[in-house]
């Protein structure tokens, strides 16, 4: 029986995850351009996925465990649990406002259009703050959305 670990195929977590696996003495052969790699010294397979696919792969049993940022875990809200926080690759989600605006507090976002790659997390946060805003999902280059007049923030 093999333990299948889902990890990020590229991006911020990739290097730290590969170091973590190496420090755990899990030896992987031919990692580049492979989606599934078996360890040469342990009954372990490593499945390389997009970070936003990892929570679902664990929840559905495609992978036994996954290494993913907590932001993706919370956003996807899949039926999986955090077993251990590994302590690397911290993430901070922020709300941005125009430079020429003096920030009066979270109520500034009331009635505004906000672009995000994390609509679930943002929606939950805004509800806890009693702020009603229009959320627009953008999966990449969120920072350019205000300049294109797609959204306010």
Could you tell me what each predicted segment is?
Residues 1-62, 78-84, 99-100, 128:
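N-terminal hydrophobic or amphipathic helices and topogenic motifs
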Residues 9, 70-71:
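Short secondary-structure boundary segments
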Residues 28-29, 131-141:
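Short hydrophobic/aromatic-enriched beta-strand-loop microsegments
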Residues 54-55, 143-145:
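Short, hydrophobic alpha-helical packing/hinge segments within bilobed ligand-binding/sensory domains
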Residues 58-59, 109, 146-149:
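Hydrophobic residues within well-ordered alpha-helices
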Residues 70, 79-132:
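A conserved helix-loop-strand patch within extracytoplasmic ligand-binding domains
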Residues 151-153:
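Conserved small/polar residues in nucleotide/adenosyl-binding loops
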